[in-house]
Amino acid sequence: MTSSTLSARLRGRLEERRPDGLFRQIEARAAQTGLIDLSNNDYLRLARNPALIKAARESLDVWGASSSASPLVSGYTEGHRALEERLAHWAGFRWGLVWNSGYAANHGVLSVLPSKGDLILIDRLAHYSMIAGALRSGARVQRFRHNDVEQLEHLLVRSERWAQVFVVTESVYSMDGDRSDLQSIAALKERFGFTWILDEAHALGWYGARGSGLAEEEGVTDAIDVFVGTLGKALGSMGAFTLFHQSCFREFLINFAGEFIYSTYLPPSCAAAALAAVNWVEAQSEERVYGHKLSAYFRERLPGSPPGDSPIVPVIFGEAVPMLRAAQTLAIAGFKVASIRPPTVPAGKSRLRISLNTALAEDDLDRLVAALEDIFR
């Protein structure tokens, strides 16, 4: 195969996506768009918080713009260590490890902790980074029906022949905004003794008395073996982290996870901003109360919206083309929303993903509901 025949093959594959509205492009976002942004994950609007910006600037003065090395060489700084310790204390764990991204953290954890002879039971709607890591591990991977604790129990009953069993779930799912039944999974762990890996990416900042997530709110922190969180959503910075009760998990990942080892480390300024965000979130419980109030207000007024209290509200269209038209109509009305289509979601489940945030007012949501009702008329 020559480069020209490869180019033809690539173009052909791309053209196959256009008729169904599945061809994707990236658009450079302007600093000022005039739109109310309901597409990103900055749920507490911390990305522009003065405390985070101040912390990042002070770190830039000390460390410069880059960590300049991988963490095992010299990229791991006092700032990264301080963030790990703060995150662990905040969420009720003993040990922490900072990663460059949520994808790297999930993929790194799931590709090296399980191995051949082990079984991974993973929720069917778990993030792609978790599924990809699990498939790379060499372990047997079985996906159970979304949020189906009964099926999970059935699979656990039949899991005795495996050396180790891992259960992998999220606390709040990114496309539907629904919650896992963490207490029921914790009860299963007490019976079966599996290793539980929980991704709290979309729950951080929104749940818990201290804002550390749904595990805190549900009182199941002690049952979790690996807690995965992100610094780039509600915490308004960049990167991710994993938390553990046992130091051997941290040490093993430092030694065996290529995603951690073979890359220039997260800039210290991002770690500093994240540390400031944790301090802010823990002190500002009223923001979480207001966020939940907004979620309830919007769901009550939007016909057909799913029950829940997370900041994520899907509006299902089914096919991609009408969903893309609806997104354009909402932009004209002053709202930027995320257009989600296969393969991110299953075929026939294309949707607008509306991400609420605490900078919104009820009047904003009233206008959004009116615009959506016009679309569906």
Explain the meaning of each model-derived region.
Residues 54, 59-101:
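Conserved N-terminal alpha-helix of the aminotransferase class I/II PLP-enzyme fold
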Residues 50, 54, 58, 62, ...:
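PLP-dependent enzyme catalytic core of the Aspartate aminotransferase-like
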Residues 2-65, 194:
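N-terminal "arm"/small-domain region of PLP-dependent enzymes with the aminotransferase-like
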Residues 109-128, 149:
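Conserved PLP-anchoring active-site segment centered on the Schiff-base-forming lysine
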Residues 142, 146-198:
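Active-site phosphate-binding strand-loop segment of PLP-dependent enzymes
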Residues 100-103, 121-137:
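Substrate-binding/gating loop at the entrance of the active-site cleft, primarily
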Residues 192-195, 202, 207-309:
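Active-site C-terminal subdomain of aminotransferase-like
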Residues 46-47, 289-334, 344, 348-349, ...:
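Conserved PLP-binding catalytic core of the aspartate aminotransferase-like
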